[in-house]
Regions:
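Conserved Walker
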Residues: 93
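Alpha-helical recognition segments enriched in aromatics with Gly/Pro capping
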Residues: 84-87, 96-222
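N-terminal Rossmann-like or analogous alpha/beta NTP/dinucleotide-binding catalytic cores
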Residues: 1-89, 195, 201
């Protein structure tokens, strides 16, 4: 069981307090638990999944994204991916029509000034120093504009907190953790298509076998 708890908060879930508004775009593992029962909002949400797995008796190994990145378990893959960012950006455009990564690197540093993730977009990789240059600016997430703080800085991929974009992160994890099989939902089909190519051609590690599943529906049918 892998928790993507370094992903940023994109919106406030129904039923959660409005106090989370100030934390939009921050990694969920750096947001205080609004109910005070876990070390972060991210761990609060992960506990719901883990409780379900425990109740049905599923055996699992639990990994957190924040620990994976802090421990440097993906640093070699990040370096290789960023070295090939131009090639990857062009391939993403070719495979799924997304042009964003022809302009920005597929890596989000956590802004050193405001702790937001998605507002800090990196534009250049300094290969010999293993640092990305970034600027924190206004970014639209869903239908909401999130204000950036304007900070410009550099982030060391071996020390400073940050994460790969989903279009390349799966490939890095598959390679680092020797993943041979991974199922995925049809909503992330484009990401899997790109990650398969990144694993095979950039990281030179065969992508895992896949099974695609349909969407899970909640009680409201969403």
């Amino acid at each position: 069981a892998y928790s993507d708890d370094l992903d940023g908060l994109r919106k406030i879930p129904v039923g959660f307090p409005d106090s989370l508004e100030e934390h939009l775009a921050k990694p969920v593992s750096l947001i205080p638990d609004p109910y005070g029962c876990h070390d972060s909002y991210g761990m609060h949400m992960s506990s719901i999944l883990l409780d379900g797995l425990d109740k049905v008796g599923i055996k699992y190994e639990f990994r957190r994204a924040i620990d994976t990145y802090k421990q440097g378990l993906l640093k070699d893959q990040i370096h290789t991916i960023l070295q090939n960012n131009t090639k990857i950006g062009d391939k993403i455009s070719e495979l799924v029509g997304q042009e964003k990564y022809q302009k920005y690197l597929p890596y989000f540093p956590v802004c050193a000034n405001c702790n937001r993730l998605y507002t800090a977009e990196s534009t250049e990789y300094i290969i010999d120093e293993k640092k990305v240059k970034y600027r924190c600016h206004d970014t639209e997430i869903g239908s909401k504009m999130i204000k950036g703080c304007g900070h410009e800085g550099e982030a060391d991929i071996t020390k400073d907190l940050g994460k790969l974009a989903w279009k390349v992160e799966f490939a890095a994890r598959w390679t680092a953790f020797d993943i041979r099989f991974e199922a995925y939902g049809k909503d992330i089909m484009d990401s899997v298509k790109v990650n398969d190519w990144v694993a095979d051609e950039i990281l030179e590690c065969p992508h895992p076998h896949h099974v695609k599943y349909e969407m899970f529906l909640d009680k409201g049918g969403k």
